[in-house]
């Protein structure tokens, strides 16, 4: 797709959907706050990766060259505490779980970032940023730490809407702070913890400083889009903006935030003990099915997890997969075509994936009708469009990444012929009002794991029954 229709995105800073206009025509720069690698990734972590991978794929489909940066926070209080409790070196602990996150992203075919900087690899840039803030009067030292002076930056709170009088950083009381609303840029060295030399003494970086330094290093002082979970709006992203602008730079021009994965209405988190780790989830469903599920809701919506919702997503994905395989068996090769205009309209409307998926399933229904009526050209046209649309969503069933059924194509063809014959017999029985025979045929198919749905266009069949 070379023509670029108007893309509109919800900007948290504006509190509204805005036309997206990149800094440089044809180029888009994106920074996504990545993982703090303290433990196994769960579906709440990975949802942001999937959501903004769809954004990236759509921008690429629109013809943009996309620079996509996703950082790794590999030094943090939680990492240090967990490593110490386990009797392991902190760097080994971080490296172990960084690999686990990489494996999770790869399993769900999240495109690798253009660069994936680690916090510990950019200490020099962080120190330079803090020095600039001190020189400009926006930061100060206290008891070996360095803090950002919130009152020195009058625009503080513009992203989150927090009034300065109501600010609580969640850092606890610190003796070196002039004001408890200030936040930490640098933590003074403590016995047994890693530390780096600076003009104000040894120590390690604060979380909020890390992302500013790495975003500047890879995307420059001003870039297009900053992404992350909605829980990062305050204080993390608010504090990033304050540092960058107080230092005399710009920062992100659009802020996109995804909703949480919830269970029982509560955010999925390790502290609540309600997490579903990616390795465990991949024992329950295939990676493409999990990706489909995580990407199926609007990115700004909460995604309430339930087994029923997960299985509904699996059934929907399998329905698309089976249609594409039926077309390939009956008609031949199915190459990706073009997404239909309504799909494009949906994604251009703040990545409205539910509406986009509705177009996928409408195309599947039309394609099945065409296939059953012998209109192979019409079925192929819908199948090619579906491949394009599902590819943009990152879960095209016929893509080599997800293709697991080549070896069963011949068997699927045989099943299709046999099921069609049975359904024809069932239709004859229904015409003759022989309901007992019609039910017997349907039950026989169900016992074989084949679900039959009667529609206005005739019976449709899918695999997926449990044979019970």
Swiss-Prot record:
GO cellular component entries: cytosol
Cofactor: Zn(2+)
InterPro entries documented for this protein: Cys-tRNA-ligase, Cys-tRNA-synt_Ia_DALR, Cys-tRNA/MSH_ligase, Rossmann-like_a/b/a_fold, tRNA-synt_1_cat_dom, tRNAsynth_Ia_anticodon-bd
Enzyme class, UniProt record, top EC level: ligase
Record EC number: 6.1.1.16
Catalytic activity: tRNA(Cys) + L-cysteine + ATP = L-cysteinyl-tRNA(Cys) + AMP + diphosphate
One record GO biological process: cysteinyl-tRNA aminoacylation
SMART domains: DALR_2
Keyword Aminoacyl-tRNA synthetase: yes
Residues spanned by motif 'KMSKS' region: 267-271
Keywords of this entry: Aminoacyl-tRNA synthetase, ATP-binding, Cytoplasm, Ligase, Metal-binding, Nucleotide-binding, Protein biosynthesis, Zinc
Keyword Lyase: no
The record's free-text note on cofactor binding: Binds 1 zinc ion per subunit.
Family the entry assigns: Belongs to the class-I aminoacyl-tRNA synthetase family.
Protein known as: Cysteine--tRNA ligase
Organism the protein comes from: Mycolicibacterium paratuberculosis (strain ATCC BAA-968 / K-10)
């Amino acid at each position: 797709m070379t023509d670029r229709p108007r893309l509109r995105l919800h900007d948290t800073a504006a509190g509204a959907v805005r036309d997206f206009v990149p800094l440089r025509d044809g180029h888009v720069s994106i920074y996504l706050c990545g993982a703090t690698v303290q433990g196994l990734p769960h579906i709440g972590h990975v949802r942001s990766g999937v959501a903004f991978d769809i954004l990236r794929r759509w921008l690429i489909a629109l013809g943009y060259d996309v620079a996509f940066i996703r950082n790794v926070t590999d030094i943090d209080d939680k990492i240090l505490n967990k490593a110490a409790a386990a009797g392991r070196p902190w760097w080994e602990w971080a490296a172990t779980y960084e690999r686990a996150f990489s494996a999770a992203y790869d399993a769900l075919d999240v495109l690798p970032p253009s660069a994936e900087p680690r916090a510990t690899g950019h200490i020099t840039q962080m120190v330079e940023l803090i020095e600039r803030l001190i020189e400009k009067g926006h930061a100060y030292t206290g008891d070996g730490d360095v803090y950002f002076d919130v009152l020195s930056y009058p625009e503080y709170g513009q992203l989150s809407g927090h009034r300065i009088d109501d600010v609580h950083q969640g850092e606890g009381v610190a003796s070196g702070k002039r004001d408890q609303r200030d936040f930490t840029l640098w933590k003074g060295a403590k016995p047994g913890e890693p530390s780096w030399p600076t003009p104000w003494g040894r120590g390690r970086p604060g979380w909020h400083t890390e992302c500013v330094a790495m975003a500047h290093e890879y995307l420059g002082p001003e870039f297009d889009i900053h992404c992350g979970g909605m829980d990062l709006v305050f204080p993390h992203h608010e504090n990033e903006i304050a540092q960058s602008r107080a230092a005399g730079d710009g920062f992100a021009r659009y802020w996109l935030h995804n909703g949480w994965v919830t269970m029982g209405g509560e955010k999925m988190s390790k502290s609540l003990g309600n997490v579903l780790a990616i390795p465990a989830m991949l024992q329950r469903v295939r990676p493409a099915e999990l990706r489909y599920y995580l990407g199926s809701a609007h990115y700004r919506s909460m995604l309430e997890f339930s087994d029923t919702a997960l299985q509904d997503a699996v059934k929907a994905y399998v329905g698309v997969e089976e249609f594409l395989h039926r077309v390939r068996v009956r008609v031949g090769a199915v190459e990706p075509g073009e997404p239909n205009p309504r799909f494009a309209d949906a994604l251009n409307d703040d990545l409205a994936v539910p509406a986009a998926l509705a177009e996928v399933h409408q195309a599947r229904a039309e394609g099945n009708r065409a296939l059953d009526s012998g209109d192979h050209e019409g079925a192929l046209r819908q199948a090619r469009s579906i491949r394009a649309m599902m590819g943009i969503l990152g879960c095209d069933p016929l893509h080599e990444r997800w293709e697991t059924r080549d070896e069963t194509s011949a068997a699927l063809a045989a099943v299709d012929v046999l099921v069609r014959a049975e359904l024809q017999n069932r239709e004859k029985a229904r015409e003759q009002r022989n309901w007992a025979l019609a039910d017997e045929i349907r039950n026989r198919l169900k016992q074989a794991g084949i679900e039959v749905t009667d529609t206005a266009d005739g019976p449709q069949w899918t695999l997926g029954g449990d044979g019970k």
